[in-house]
Structures are given as structure tokens and as C-alpha cells.
Amino acid sequence: MSHGAVAETELPDPRAVLSPRELEVLDLAALGLTNLQIATRLHVTVHAVKFHLAAVYRKLGVSNRTEAVVLRLRTGGLAGGAATDTTDLVA
């Protein structure tokens, strides 16, 4: 068994460890939105977005946004839904 295969089976499922709001923030980050865009979309402050992202990193055991997004995508994230609807983001 390769090391990569072992690491993949040990990945935490974000849906199991994150709150619904943390998952929503992570999904929007995965779409490439900035903290300001996420804050605007969710009607919260940029500070609140940063707070949620810090909790995401801690709960998933990652150290940055890219690692969190990769983990979310590897565990079946972004299947659709309100958080992934970008129609209101088109200029």
C-alpha cells in the first residue's frame, strides 16, 4: 500500500467535524472567493470569516486555506447547493 493511499483514508471528513457555517465558508473559499466576498455573501464581517476559517484549519488539522480546500475537494465537497451558487457573483 502506498503512503498516499494511507494518508487519504485518514483524512477527516469536513462534513463530520465542521459546523454548517464553517462548511459554508470553506465551500465559498473553495470557489475562490476572497474573505471580503465571503463576508458580503454571508452578511457577516471579514473578521467573522477569518474566525470561521481559523476554526476550519484547527478542526481539519491543516495550516492554510489551500490545504483546507484540497481536503474538502478530496472528501466529496462542493456537490452543489446554495453555497456554491455563484450566479450573484457575475459582474
Residues covered by each model-derived region:
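Conserved catalytic core of two-component sensor histidine kinases
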Residues: 19, 26, 50
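A cross-family signal for key residues in well-ordered alpha-helices
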Residues: 27, 40, 70
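Basic, Lys/Arg-enriched C-terminal extension of HTH/homeodomain DNA-binding domains
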Residues: 10, 58-91
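Regulatory hinge/linker segments at domain boundaries
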Residues: 2-23, 81, 85-88
